[in-house]
Amino acid sequence: MTSETVIAPSLSTAQNDGTFTYDKVKSTAKERKHLNLKNPSDANEIKSKIWNYYSLSELIQYLGQKENDDFKYKRITLQFPDNLICDSATIVHELQRELNIVPQANQDTGESNTAQRVWILADTSYSACCVDEVAAEHVRSDLVVHFGDACLNEIDKLQAVFVLGKPTLDVDAIVKQIKTAYSTEQKVVLMSDAPHTYLLPEIAKQLPDYDILIADLPKTSRAKIIGYTPPPTGHKKFNRVFNTDTVEFGKYELFHITSPESPRLLQLTTNFASVTTYDPISGTVSTGPFPNLMRRYKYVHQARMAGTVGILVNTLSLANTKVLLNTIKEKIKEAGKKHYIFVVGKPNVAKLANFESVDIWCILGCDHQGIIIDQINEYYKPIVTPYELLLGLSDELSWTGKWVVDYKSVLEEYGNEVIQQNEDPDTDEDLPPVFDPVTGRYVSTSKPLRQINHLMVTSSEQGGVDDHDNQLVKRFSNAVAIKGTVSTSAIHLQNRHWTGLGSDYTEDENATGALVEDGRKGIARGYDI
């Protein structure tokens, strides 16, 4: 044997921090371009910018109002768009500190009748320019503070406060763009989104040789604008106020700061001689292409030929929404067509594609962001506005090219119009055939409820329809009816190649179905059992 020392073999590899590389979550600082921060990591600078941008001093003074030694607003909800949600935590902290509001997590379970409370509303990414009354009612709010750009449409129930913010602009660059685009002989309207409106007078002052008309913000009856004083009077149009009695907008060129959404842009392009948009971030201008109005004329004809109309309700907070909804329902019924009402939240192609029996959609939404303008034929069925639908349902289709989205204007034009119907059942077969002007095909289902009072579907085998029959769809000599009324959905189901599980059986299903019972009612916060 040798005297050498035996070294035990290493059972593991020596490891240190440099042996392996671990993936780490990268911390990305929020840009907050709207605040123009020089040092994004400085908390004091961020707080100071937020105070100035949102005019928090005036907001706190408004929220601290009292009536009879008690707070006027106790349940306050804050609504933020997606691009401003990064400031929500700081704003809530400042409001709680200045108003002496105890955070909700530190309060007792019992609700106080004198204390103020603050909530941040969630899920308002679609049509964020409107006040979300439905979300505010979940906490029984008595005031909604809306931050960011707003459509400023009249709201229905709640009191609201608009905090638009005070963004900055390169005024000299905008003045240079206006001088390049227009001559002194042209009439120009200066317009922007709501947050940039306070800068328009400053821009107009630097253009003394031009005929400039400023689009100011309107005064709303149930809302206050923080940091801005709207003019008391003026000509109101496009949710703006013009300092004149009457305006012929067709003779004016529009220079719009920021690029509006498609519904707003289509509304403006149909009323002005030309439209030029300015992007304040890139500093570039654009003169098109913009949404096409001729496509809307095609949809009006398709609405005239449609047999089933889906009414898509995108907002319930705007004034006159319920009145317009009831008016549309009556007009559809007078025209002999069927309708269904849908509330699907944020619409998309997949949601609307589930309802194949709907021939055309009528959308009730905000004229700024709540109307779907399908420019690339993404949706399977056409989507029209209430004005376009009522225009298509009228007896004589005559369109001047104007595009109306204001609820009040639509009601004034079509609210009292009566659609004529032929009440003589004997002359129904003598009516001229209906052809689709778009495709040229014969349309037999454009008025499925025509003369509903005289509709009789009989069977030679049974001699009529049994009121106690529980079968959903009856086929009588090539007709499809539900309890004696023609069903467009049943006709659509009958014409499909595959109608669901069990459709390959020829015998009738005689089994008794389950009884329908009342379920829970209310919202997720508290159901009524």
Swiss-Prot record:
<dbReference type="GO" id="GO:0017183">
    <property type="term" value="P:protein histidyl modification to diphthamide"/>
</dbReference>
<feature type="binding site">
    <location>
        <position position="366"/>
    </location>
    <ligand>
        <name>[4Fe-4S] cluster</name>
    </ligand>
</feature>
<dbReference type="GO" id="GO:0090560">
    <property type="term" value="F:2-(3-amino-3-carboxypropyl)histidine synthase activity"/>
</dbReference>
<keyword id="KW-0411">Iron-sulfur</keyword>
<feature type="binding site">
    <location>
        <position position="151"/>
    </location>
    <ligand>
        <name>[4Fe-4S] cluster</name>
    </ligand>
</feature>
<comment type="pathway">
    <text>Protein modification; peptidyl-diphthamide biosynthesis.</text>
</comment>
<dbReference type="GO" id="GO:0051539">
    <property type="term" value="F:4 iron, 4 sulfur cluster binding"/>
</dbReference>
<dbReference type="GO" id="GO:0005737">
    <property type="term" value="C:cytoplasm"/>
</dbReference>
<keyword id="KW-0963">Cytoplasm</keyword>
<keyword id="KW-0408">Iron</keyword>
<dbReference type="InterPro" id="IPR042265">
    <property type="entry name" value="DPH1/DPH2_3"/>
</dbReference>
<comment type="similarity">
    <text>Belongs to the DPH1/DPH2 family. DPH2 subfamily.</text>
</comment>
<dbReference type="InterPro" id="IPR016435">
    <property type="entry name" value="DPH1/DPH2"/>
</dbReference>
<feature type="binding site">
    <location>
        <position position="130"/>
    </location>
    <ligand>
        <name>[4Fe-4S] cluster</name>
    </ligand>
</feature>
<dbReference type="Pfam" id="PF01866">
    <property type="entry name" value="Diphthamide_syn"/>
</dbReference>
<dbReference type="InterPro" id="IPR010014">
    <property type="entry name" value="DHP2"/>
</dbReference>
<comment type="function">
    <text>Required for the first step of diphthamide biosynthesis, a post-translational modification of histidine which occurs in elongation factor 2. DPH1 and DPH2 transfer a 3-amino-3-carboxypropyl (ACP) group from S-adenosyl-L-methionine (SAM) to a histidine residue, the reaction is assisted by a reduction system comprising DPH3 and a NADH-dependent reductase, predominantly CBR1. Facilitates the reduction of the catalytic iron-sulfur cluster found in the DPH1 subunit.</text>
</comment>
<protein>
    <recommendedName>
        <fullName>2-(3-amino-3-carboxypropyl)histidine synthase subunit 2-1</fullName>
    </recommendedName>
</protein>
<comment type="subunit">
    <text>Component of the 2-(3-amino-3-carboxypropyl)histidine synthase complex composed of DPH1, DPH2, DPH3 and a NADH-dependent reductase, predominantly CBR1.</text>
</comment>
<keyword id="KW-0479">Metal-binding</keyword>
<dbReference type="InterPro" id="IPR042263">
    <property type="entry name" value="DPH1/DPH2_1"/>
</dbReference>
<dbReference type="GO" id="GO:0120513">
    <property type="term" value="C:2-(3-amino-3-carboxypropyl)histidine synthase complex"/>
</dbReference>
<dbReference type="GO" id="GO:0046872">
    <property type="term" value="F:metal ion binding"/>
</dbReference>
